[in-house]
Design a protein with these regions (language model features):
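Phosphate-ester processing/binding pockets and catalytic centers
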Residues: 2-81, 86-350
Length: 350
C-alpha cells in the first residue's frame, strides 16, 4: 500500500526556449518524491531532567535512554495529537497499563476517509462507537477488525506507546505510598489544582508525566498538541477536582520536560457524538487491553480467554509497521524490593 502522505517536488527543471521567442518556452521536469521523515533512531534523552526531579522523571529518563530504539519523526508536521486509554482497574489485573497513541494529526485525512468507507461496508456508520478490546467477540466489528488493524498500520504516522506498571508498585513518586501521595495531594491543593485523593493524584501524575516526557521527544517548536482521552477518573468533573484541573496539571508538567514552545495545547475527552477521533482512540484501548492480557499470561502461564479477535490483536501489536512504531515498556517490582524496567519484545509465532 502506498504511503498516505506522499508528496512530490520538481527535482530538476531544464528550460528549452526557442531562440528569441519568449512566449514559446518549454520545460522538461523530473519529478522526484520527497524523502519522507517517518522515523528517527536513538539514543534519546530527557534533557531537562535533573537530580531535583521526582523519582518517576528519573525512571522515565532511564527508560528512554536504555529501552527506546526508535520514535516517529514529526519534524515536518504542524499538529500532534495524543490519544490515551488506561487499563488494569479490575482486581485480577497484575499491571496498570497506560497506553498512548501519538499521531501526526495533520495527516489523518486518508485514515479518516478509509475508515468511513470501511464502516459503511460493514454497517457501522449509523451506530458509531469505538473498537473496544472488551467488546469484539461477535458482530460487524469482529468482521471489520482485520481491515481496521490494517488501516491503522498503513495510514497512521505515529507511535503506540504502552507503559505497564506492576500493581505491587504502589507509588512511583517516592519510597512509600503514604508519604509520597500525601505530599502530592498537598501540593496539588496548594497550587489550586484540585483536591485529589491519594490514588487519583498518583494516577493523574503518572499519566501527565508520561505524556510530557514523550511530548518532549516528539514535538517541535510552535507545533500544536491535542490530548484526547477516554472518560476516566482523571477527567471527570467532580466536586473537588475536574477536567480543567487535569489540563492545568499537564500544562505545568509539560514545562518540566519541554525545552521548546508549543503554539497551542488543546484538550478533549471522548464526545457523546462519536467520530474519527474515537477510531484513533480505539488504538490505545486495544493496546492497553492486549498488553494487560499478555503480561497476565506471562505471569500466570494461563491461556488468555477469547476468540480469534484477541489473537488477531496480539498478532497486530507484535508485528512492526512502516509508519506506526509500537513500544511496550514494563516496570516491575524486583525480588530485592527495587524497581526494574525493560522493553517488552514480542514476536509472532509462524
Amino acid at each position: 500500500m502506498k504511503p498516505p502522505f506522499k508528496k512530490t517536488v520538481i527535482g530538476e527543471a531544464t528550460e528549452l526556449p526557442e531562440t528569441g521567442v519568449f512566449d514559446s518556452v518549454k520545460f522538461s521536469a523530473i519529478v522526484a518524491p520527497v524523502e519522507q521523515k517517518v522515523k528517527k533512531v536513538g539514543p534519546f534523552k530527557l534533557s531537562k531532567v535533573t537530580d531535583e526531579y521526582p523519582y518517576f522523571s528519573d525512571l522515565l529518563n532511564r527508560i528512554v535512554q536504555q529501552s527506546i530504539r526508535e520514535l516517529p519523526d514529526f519534524s515536518d508536521d504542524s499538529k500532534i495529537a495524543v490519544m490515551s486509554d488506561f487499563g488494569g482497574e479490575h482486581s485480577s489485573a497484575k499491571f496498570h497499563t497506560y497506553s498512548f497513541l501519538f499521531v501526526a494529526y495533520n495527516k489523518v485525512g486518508p485514515f479518516e476517509e478509509k475508515i468511513r468507507e470501511m464502516r459503511k461496508r460493514y454497517g457501522l456508520l449509523e451506530h458509531y462507537s469505538e473498537f473496544a478490546y472488551k467488546n469484539l467477540s461477535s458482530g460487524a466489528k469482529a468482521r471489520a477488525l482485520p481491515e481496521y488493524l490494517q488501516l491503522v498500520d498503513s495510514f497512521i504516522h505515529g507511535a503506540i506507546i504502552t507503559i505497564a506498571i506492576d500493581k505491587r508498585i504502589e507509588t512511583v513518586f517516592g519510597a512509600q505510598k503514604k508519604q509520597a501521595q500525601s505530599v502530592m495531594v498537598t501540593q496539588l491543593k496548594e497550587e489550586g489544582l484540585g483536591e485529589w485523593h491519594g490514588p487519583g493524584a498518583e494516577k493523574v501524575l503518572r499519566i501527565v508525566n508520561i505524556i510530557a516526557a514523550f511530548a518532549s521527544l516528539l514535538t517541535h517548536e510552535n507545533q500544536r498538541l491535542l490530548w484526547y482521552s477516554d472518560r476516566d477518573l482523571i477527567n471527570e468533573d467532580g466536586k473537588k477536582w475536574n477536567f480543567t484541573h487535569t489540563q492545568q496539571i499537564l500544562v505545568r508538567v509539560l514545562g518540566m520536560y519541554l525545552s521548546h514552545r508549543l503554539d497551542v495545547v488543546g484538550f478533549a475527552k471522548s464526545f457523546k457524538e462519536k467520530g474519527h477521533l474515537d477510531d484513533l482512540l480505539s488504538v490505545p484501548d486495544l493496546a492497553a487491553g492486549v498488553v494487560q492480557d499478555l503480561l497476565l499470561q506471562n505471569e500466570t502461564g494461563e491461556d488468555i480467554p477469547g476468540g480469534d479477535e484477541k489473537a488477531m490483536i496480539m498478532q497486530w501489536i507484535a508485528t512492526p509497521a512502516r509508519y506506526l512504531s509500537k513500544l511496550t515498556i514494563q516496570i516491575v517490582r524486583m525480588a530485592d524490593g527495587g524497581i526494574g524496567f525493560g522493553r517488552v519484545d514480542m514476536a509472532v509465532k509462524r
